[in-house]
Swiss-Prot record:
Binding site for Zn(2+): 173, 175, 186
Signal peptide residue numbers: none
Parts of the chain that traverse the membrane: none
Gene Ontology biological-process annotations: proteolysis
An example Gene Ontology molecular-function term: metallopeptidase activity
Protein name as it appears in the record: UPF0758 protein LMHCC_1020
Pfam families in alphabetical order: RadC, UPF0758_N
Family of the protein in this entry: Belongs to the UPF0758 family.
Locus of motif JAMM motif: 173-186
Domain MPN: 102-224
């Protein structure tokens, strides 16, 4: 079915106006973003192809512009629109989290980072920076790649913490294997971070390892 053959009630824009944005499927949302189909395919057909390319919609946030362009019917203009929409959503999410979230326990923090870290194919070392009320004031990925003591240097972590006037930090990294069990390097990095935090007066509240839909809090396990 081509774009001009889609009935009025089936068009994503009309569906949004009649029933609200929540009524749209992921494919329909993408169709609204890319706007047009091709001579031979409707915008919904192309949008559905994009959704099917990824295991879940969350994985789209890690795709490059080249990966989107591998989808038949997607050129640089449409790929750019998709990436812009994803980036805007990420920025809104971060601002909302920073304004509202108080971290009272590891589970509170995991809810913030699990969607971002759980399905990555490389290790990412990520930090939350908190004020004296345990509110998140900033967050950032500090390192990407294999976690070891020579790469994850406390200096880089606490330089940013001092710049943001953080009272404490929580650190996270993912295990692409899905198994969150800590390695000896994980424990060494944690020890060095905790010691550095004591020196500069910024507490390391926890170092949490993220697996596939599960995690391990090194603080809860008594590793530091």
């Amino acid at each position: 079915m081509l774009t001009n053959e889609i009935s009025e009630n089936e068009k994503p824009r009309e569906k949004l106006l009649n029933y609200g944005i929540e009524s749209l499927s992921s494919s329909e949302l993408v169709a609204l973003i890319i706007e047009t189909g091709t001579k031979n395919e409707s915008v919904l057909t192309i949008a559905n192809r994009i959704i099917m390319k990824f295991k879940n919609v969350a994985e789209m946030q890690y795709a490059s512009i080249e990966e989107f362009q591998l989808v038949n019917g997607i050129g640089v203009a449409k790929a750019s629109k998709i990436m812009a929409a994803i980036e805007l959503g990420k920025r809104i999410s971060i601002v909302t989290e920073q304004e509202e979230v108080v971290v009272r326990c590891p589970e509170d923090a995991v809810k913030l980072v699990m969607p971002e870290l759980a399905f990555l194919f490389q290790e990412h070392f990520h930090c939350l920076f908190l004020n004296t009320k345990n509110q998140v004031i900033y967050r950032q990925t500090i390192f990407v790649g294999g976690l070891n003591a020579s790469i994850v240097h406390p200096r880089e972590v606490f330089r940013l913490a001092l710049r943001k006037s953080a009272a404490s930090i929580m650190c996270f990294h993912n295990h692409p294997s899905g198994d969150p069990a800590p390695s000896s390097e994980d424990l060494l990095v944690t020890k060095r971070l905790a010691e550095a935090g004591n020196i500069v007066g910024i507490t390391l509240l926890d170092h949490i390892i993220i697996g596939k839909n599960k995690y391990i809090s090194l603080k809860e396990k008594g590793y530091f």
